[in-house]
């Protein structure tokens, strides 16, 4: 099961995204933040361990770009993806430069985000021993 952290300031989007991901993917959202400050506080806590961080770029306070930069500086192993309404070529390039593995457009790439999460879940599940059937 993927342990995820969500950085999203819209309560409606956050609620719908959590419900969708937890229904369709073996994933549990451990927490969320609606601002850069609260995201960094959560991520800075050594007891908060996650496999995936989903980041919106425009937050109630601060920027998702700064959250990505922080994750890059700390060397956290979690996969980082961006979910934004502003997925231009330039924004995608900047996010990838800050360590995002993928950038998804909220308006048309939710299915691609789900597929990405399913691939992560498949990669993180232990392989069955030789001769064992699934």
Task: Please name every model-derived segment.
Residues 32-52:
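Acidic, metal-coordinating helix/loop segments flanking the phosphotransfer/catalytic sites
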Residues 90, 108-118:
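C-terminal output helix
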Residues 60, 88:
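The feature encodes the CheY-like receiver
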Residues 8:
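Conserved acidic carboxylate
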Residues 65-76:
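Short amphipathic alpha-helix used as the core "switch/output" element in two-component signaling
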Residues 11-31:
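Two-component/phosphorelay signaling modules centered on CheY-like receiver
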Residues 35, 63-66:
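Acidic catalytic/metal-coordinating carboxylates
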Residues 56-57, 84:
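Active-site residues of response regulator receiver
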């Amino acid at each position: 099961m993927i342990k995820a952290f969500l950085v999203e300031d819209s309560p409606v989007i956050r609620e719908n995204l959590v419900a969708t991901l937890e229904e369709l993917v073996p994933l549990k959202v451990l927490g969320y933040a609606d601002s850069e400050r609260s995201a960094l506080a959560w991520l800075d806590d050594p007891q908060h361990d996650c496999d995936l961080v989903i980041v919106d770029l425009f937050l109630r306070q601060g920027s998702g770009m700064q959250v990505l930069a922080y994750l890059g500086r700390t060397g956290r192993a979690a996969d980082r993806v961006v979910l934004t309404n502003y997925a231009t070529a330039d924004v995608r390039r900047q996010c990838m430069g800050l360590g995002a593995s993928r950038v998804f457009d909220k308006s048309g790439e939710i299915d691609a985000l789900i597929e990405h999460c399913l691939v992560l879940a498949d990669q993180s599940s232990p392989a069955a021993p030789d001769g064992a059937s699934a």
